[in-house]
Structure formats: C-alpha cells, structure tokens
C-alpha cells in the first residue's frame, strides 16, 4: 500500500500514468511557493524561526484543507468550483493570509533601512524566472502532454506578453 495516503481519499484525477511520487512533489511545490508568497508580506519584520513555524502551521491548518475543498472532492469541488492551476488554492488563499499577516505585524520601521533604487536587470531576471516557473505550474496541472497543457502554456505566454506590454506603456 501507499503509506503516505493510508486512510485518505485520493482525488480522482487523470494522472496519465504518472507515479504518485511525482504528484506529491508537484503538490508540495505548490505548498512551498504559497508560503513563500505569504512571507513577503512580513519580510524583515519577524524572526526567521518564527517564519518557519508560521509556514509549517499554516500549511497544515489552512492550506491543506483548502486544497482538499477545491482539488480533493471537498465541499467547493462538489459545488462546481474549478481551479486548474491554483487561482483559488494558491492566490486567493495566500493573498488573504498575507494581508492578515501584514496587518498583524504592522508597518515596517522606515528609519532602519535606506532602500536602494530598483535594479532593472534584477527585475527582468526575477520576472523571467517567475515566467518559466509558471509554465511548469500551469502546464503541469494538466497532468500530461495534452491539449489542456498546450492551452495552459499558450494562455501563460499571452498573459506574460500582455503584462510586459502594459509595464512598458506605464514605464
């Protein structure tokens, strides 16, 4: 048997022959990225050890139940809520958590640091890494090389192009 999922119902997805370990790593990556997004809302205002404790507790108490509700056949899934690559589970979930965390922790002390101006090269490198990563998340959510994966890649590319154009117009 599979000891990791003993006693749990596994959502009925078309894994297209993917080993369960691949899905575990894929889903764990979603969880890691989600907590990293939240950490930006209180960066440099709490100790690193407190951040790790928060991430561990939040992942179990908040993230895991929401994943089940949306992706695992839970109440939201039964009501017809669709979340292909994490719009609800990742973005809404961590957006709310980040807002609450920022409110609880409070403002940064502006007199401690003098922030250097933004570096355009770092901005482009960071955006490029994020862009490539989202290809993996969005296309990977199709669980195979199929039409859904191709459409996810196309939409990701179009959204990136639109965002880049909007940024150039604003700047």
For each of these PLM feature ranges, what is it?
Residues 1-171:
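Hydrophobic alpha-helical transmembrane bundles of multi-pass membrane proteins
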């Amino acid at each position: 048997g599979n000891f990791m999922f003993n006693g749990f119902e596994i959502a009925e997805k078309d894994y297209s022959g993917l080993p369960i370990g691949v899905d575990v790593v894929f889903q764990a990556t979603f969880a890691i990225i989600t907590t990293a997004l939240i950490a930006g809302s209180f960066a440099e205002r709490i100790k690193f050890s407190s951040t790790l404790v928060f991430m561990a507790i939040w992942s179990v108490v908040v993230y895991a139940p929401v994943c089940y509700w949306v992706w695992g056949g839970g109440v939201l899934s039964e009501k017809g809520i669709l979340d292909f690559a994490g719009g609800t589970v990742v973005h809404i979930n961590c957006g709310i958590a980040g807002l609450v965390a920022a409110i609880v922790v409070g403002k940064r002390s502006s007199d401690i640091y003098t922030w250097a101006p933004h570096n355009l090269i770092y901005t482009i490198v960071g955006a490029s890494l994020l862009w490539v990563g989202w290809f993996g998340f969005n296309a990977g959510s199709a669980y195979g090389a199929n039409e859904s994966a191709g459409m996810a890649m196309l939409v990701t590319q179009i959204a990136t192009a639109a965002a880049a154009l909007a940024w150039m117009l604003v700047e």
